[in-house]
């Protein structure tokens, strides 16, 4: 009888120890994936500086695959929220690959649509979480003003056949970012809003590089900000699952 009484607490302690060990393993694996992402982004910047297409093909897919790994390690497959985030990240990886070739407008347009679909997936993920209406309203107004200003600056420089896709992209990324802010405002992890805002800001660098003035400076700040954004979103399933 005494053995039976002590077995229960001992089993609970063993389960807790195993859970802690699993958490440590996930943290180490996630950290390793983030380090790989950082290293690949650094190498990508070197390739961009040297305008090496071979370097871009070697480094960009690795950097993007790393944020997929971060999401998987963070438990993205364990919830509807996580699975939608993982879907969005996968579409972003596809967009990253499609944006590597230069001077091919059709491929670039396909990349834009891949990112557009990715933002829809992120927005759907945020709709699975509680949201703050006041935060949603403030974020929406702020984003309308900011993106309208960017549109006025960018639209005269766009090819005619790209104006409608870019307008649609602005609309979707604005909705996605507003929803992210609403989730964080309702008590959700701040990294959700931070990731969405960083993503939106990084797209300005892409737009300037593609349609206004192509120079390394755009990529020097836009690429690190973009990968930071997606790593933050990739980490969010682990925080959501604990909340």
Where do the model's predicted regions map?
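Polytopic alpha-helical membrane-helix bundles and their juxtamembrane interface segments
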Residues: 25-243
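P-loop/Walker A NTP-binding region and its immediately flanking N-terminal helices
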Residues: 19
């Amino acid at each position: 009888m005494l053995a039976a009484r002590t077995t229960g607490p001992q089993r609970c302690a063993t389960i807790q120890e195993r859970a802690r060990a699993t958490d440590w393993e996930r943290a180490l694996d996630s950290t390793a994936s983030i380090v790989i992402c950082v290293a690949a982004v650094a190498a990508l910047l070197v390739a961009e500086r040297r305008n090496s297409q071979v370097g871009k093909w070697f480094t960009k897919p690795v950097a993007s695959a790393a944020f997929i790994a971060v999401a998987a390690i963070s438990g993205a497959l364990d919830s509807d929220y996580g699975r939608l985030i993982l879907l969005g990240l996968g579409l972003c990886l596809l967009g990253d690959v499609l944006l590597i070739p230069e001077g091919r407008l059709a491929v670039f347009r396909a990349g834009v649509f891949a990112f557009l679909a990715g933002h829809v997936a992120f927005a759907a993920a945020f709709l699975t979480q509680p949201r703050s209406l006041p935060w949603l309203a403030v974020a929406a107004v702020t984003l309308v003003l900011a993106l309208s200003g960017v549109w006025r600056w960018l639209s005269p420089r766009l090819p005619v056949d790209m104006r409608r896709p870019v307008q649609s992209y602005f609309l979707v990324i604005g909705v996605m970012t507003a929803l992210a802010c609403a989730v964080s405002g309702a008590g959700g992890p701040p990294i959700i809003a931070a990731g969405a805002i960083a993503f939106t800001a990084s797209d300005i660098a892409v737009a300037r590089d593609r349609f206004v003035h192509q120079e390394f400076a755009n990529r020097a700040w836009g690429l690190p900000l973009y990968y930071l954004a997606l790593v933050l979103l990739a980490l969010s399933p682990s925080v959501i699952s604990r909340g």
